[in-house]
C-alpha cells in the first residue's frame, strides 16, 4: 500500500475460521483458478462467497460419516488421474484404498472389511477380475453397498508402423457380473 510516499505491506489471509461445538473449519475466501487474471479471480471469489460460507457451515454441522473405498489391484487408474475428484470428496467423506488381494485366502474377512464402506469406486480397471473377486463384489452390492464403476470397455492401440489407431474390446471378465444387474457394455 502506498501512502504519503511510503510503501507498506499488509499481510492478508484469504480465509475465515468457523467453529461449532469445539470443531473448527477453514473457509477459503479466495477461490483458486488456474489461467484467470487476478481481477477475475477476485470477482469469482466474491460471487462464490455465500456458497463458501454455507458449505463450511454445513461441514461443521454435519461431520463426515460415510466412507468411500477406492478399489486397487486390477489395474485401476493411478491416483494422479483421480486426485482432483477425490480431493473434492475428501471434505465430506472418509476415503481409503481397498484391495481384493486377500479374497483367495480369506473371502469372509474381505467381505466383512468391504462392507464397512458405503461406496466402492472402481476407476477404469484394466486387468480381469477373478470369479472370487466378482463374488465378493456381488455380495457387497447385494447387502446394500453402492458402487461407482468407471469402465472403459475399449482399448485404443496406436500402430507405430502404419500410424493408424485401432480400437479393441477390453475383456475384464465382468460381462456376467453386470448382466445380473441389467447392464450391458458394448465395446
Which residues are covered by each model-predicted region?
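Short, surface-exposed patches at the edges or C-terminal ends of soluble domains, predominantly
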Residues: 1-187
Amino acid at each position: 500500500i502506498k501512502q504519503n510516499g511510503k510503501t507498506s505491506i499488509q499481510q492478508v489471509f484469504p480465509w475465515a475460521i468457523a467453529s461449532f461445538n469445539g470443531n473448527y473449519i477453514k473457509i477459503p475466501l479466495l477461490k483458486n483458478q488456474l489461467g484467470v487474471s487476478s481481477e477475475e479471480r477476485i470477482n469469482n471469489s466474491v460471487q462464490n462467497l455465500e456458497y463458501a460460507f454455507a458449505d463450511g457451515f454445513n461441514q461443521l454441522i454435519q461431520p463426515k460419516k460415510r466412507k468411500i473405498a477406492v478399489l486397487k489391484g486390477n489395474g485401476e487408474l493411478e491416483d494422479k488421474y483421480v486426485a482432483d475428484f477425490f480431493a473434492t470428496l475428501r471434505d465430506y467423506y472418509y476415503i481409503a484404498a481397498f484391495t481384493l488381494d486377500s479374497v483367495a485366502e480369506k473371502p469372509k474377512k474381505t467381505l466383512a472389511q468391504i462392507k464397512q464402506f458405503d461406496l466402492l469406486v472402481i476407476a477404469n480397471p484394466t486387468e480381469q477380475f477373478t470369479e472370487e473377486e466378482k463374488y465378493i463384489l456381488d455380495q457387497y452390492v447385494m447387502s446394500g453397498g453402492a458402487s461407482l464403476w468407471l469402465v472403459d470397455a475399449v482399448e485404443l492401440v496406436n500402430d507405430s508402423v502404419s500410424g493408424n489407431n485401432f480400437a479393441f474390446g477390453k475383456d475384464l471378465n465382468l460381462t456376467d457380473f453386470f448382466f445380473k444387474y441389467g447392464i450391458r457394455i458394448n465395446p
